Amino acid sequence: MAKTIRLTTAQALVKFLNAQYLHADGKEEPFVEGIFTIFGHGNVLGIGQALEQDAGRLNVWQGKNEQGMAHAAMAFSKQMLRKKIYAVTTSVGPGAANLVAAAGTALANNIPVLLLPADTFATRQPDPVLQQFEQEYSQAVTTNDALKPVSRYWDRITRPEQLMSSLIRAFEVMTDPGKAGPATICIAQDVEGEAYEYPEEFFRKRIHYLERRKPTEREIEEALERIRRSKRPLLVVGGGAKYSEAKEELVALSEQCGIPLVETQAGKATVAADFANNLGGLGVTGTLAANKAAREADLVIGVGTRYTDFATSSKTAFDFEHTTFLNINVSRMQTYKLDAYQVVADAKETLSLLISRLKTYRSAFGDRIAALKEEWLAERNRLKSVVFNRKTFVPEVKEHFSQEKLNEYADALGTELPQTTALLAINETIDEDSTIICSSGSLPGDLQRLWHANEPNTYHLEYGYSCMGYEISGALGIKLAEPEREVYSIVGDGSFLMLHSELITAIQYNKKINILLFDNAGFGCISNLQMDHGGGSYYCEFLTADNQVMNIDYAKVAEGYGAKTYRANTVEQLKAALKDAKKQETSTLIEMKVLPKTMTDGYESWWNVGVAEVAASQSIQDAYQARQAKLKEAKHY
């Protein structure tokens, strides 16, 4: 007869979380670092009681917004290269609903996080309970069903014994590099407190092995043949290469064979920006060097990439008539993209084998790599020194705003600071081992093109879901992952307004984060999109009822929370603020008023977005025709 221990469902959950370990590359560590909580009537008497009684080694943090704390949990796991996670517990109803955006963010980025929303009563005795809606077609539907499409694994616990098989399945999913993502386990609030005789063996130390899948001999031989046949192969470094920690292998293969590297947002900072063959970001937000190399390549070797529309310029980045693809990925689904030859294997293992068998191969790119890189560095230097003037200023995003309108913004915001000038001043000033985080707006494009990250894993971009509000919440997660490093949240005013609640959590627990707030008084990148496609400037600027530019004192907002704040509208003020902020022990916010339309623009790239087929505006009709013409150049699938 197996020995048992009588625990509530919630107590069993906490005990199980404490017993999970991950073994990767010879190193074994606890997999669950802790749990973020916002308690409500659905979880405070269940999971809340269990944690209060015995949290074990789990760190417990009080969040301020469910989406925010789930984003912090996701960022922690992403920064830890998916080798550790946080769990997140919420109440029923609205609290659970707030997890949907965060779950989508984790799913789009293939990041494991354990979501534990409370659910309505399994017995249904008090139905409808507080924060429960009613549907006529089913009593089994709750808010938590909205989490199904955005979870890699989803389950509902209505009996205590169901917890055992559900948790084992959830951790199998979260520790598999090929399908990692959010696991959601919804626990009925009455069941959280129900007791059960759980087998003691369920709580024994459980080790999940992160094995590096090796390619088959057939996969390697075919990959070698395709590389040897090609004259101008190109390596696309995706997020999977970063999680595989394949830096040395990428550099070695590139150097040995003369193959240029380009990066996706997720793959950036796998290889140092200063590496001679690294041509930078690819696609819509990419560099001119990378986009030119992509057009010239006859073989594209995708290493751990999903080939999103931003990376492929909506499938126009490559010469599809003459270019073939070789995809290396632990996800079989991802290897099938763009009609590629598929290698379903770990990036590091595969690249190592390729290096050992390509001793004599050299690409035909030759000196072209250095020429492309030099050309782009000259452009980067120009963007570092942009200076505004009130008579003949030409912004990077041209023909949208008149000189008069730009002058009005300069007066209203009290600034003449261009966005690219400010960003590159930051890049030059902060420590190289600092980590930056960004997610949405125009800043991800500027960062992918311009930011030089030379230390591994110091560039943390969430550009799978591009979720506004991730930046500040995520900075807290990064700080929990790397407490000794400075972390900088690079965020626009639009995203700051969407969500910044976890700044309070960072201050509360003395987890210092630095917020670099670029305020251009509006949703700048969407204004660009709107006007690039024939529209006017329509509800993307932050204007008062009498059409005046809003000048919001964001520094005062952060000061009210307890952060150390700065206002910097010149490069000199910015550098001084950055140096002083580093000395602080509490969280900081540097507010920069920057001029609109001074972010970088596209470099020989295209983004397919929906344009009205019928419109009164001739400029919109022209934009529609231009889109139709461009689609003829694109791969259709």
From Swiss-Prot:
Keywords: Hydrolase, Magnesium, Metal-binding, NAD, Thiamine pyrophosphate. GO terms for cellular component: acetolactate synthase complex. GO terms for biological process: inositol catabolic process; isoleucine biosynthetic process; L-valine biosynthetic process. It comes from the Bacteria. InterPro entries: DHS-like_NAD/FAD-binding_dom, Myo_inos_IolD, THcHDO_hydrolase_firmi, THDP-binding, Thiamin_PyroP_enz_cen_dom, Thiamin_PyroP_enz_TPP-bd_dom, TPP-bd_CS, TPP_enz. Residues 442-522 are annotated as: Thiamine pyrophosphate binding. One of its GO terms (molecular function) is magnesium ion binding. Its cofactor is Mg(2+); thiamine diphosphate. Binds 1 Mg(2+) ion per subunit. Mg(2+) binds at residues 493, 520. It catalyses: 3D-3,5/4-trihydroxycyclohexane-1,2-dione + H2O = 5-deoxy-D-glucuronate + H(+). Gene3D superfamilies: 3.40.50.970, TPP-binding domain. Thiamine diphosphate binds at residue 66. CDD domains: TPP_IolD, TPP_PYR_POX_like. Its EC number is 3.7.1.22. Belongs to the TPP enzyme family. PANTHER family: 3D-(3,5_4)-TRIHYDROXYCYCLOHEXANE-1,2-DIONE HYDROLASE, THIAMINE PYROPHOSPHATE ENZYMES. HAMAP family: IolD. This is 3D-(3,5/4)-trihydroxycyclohexane-1,2-dione hydrolase.
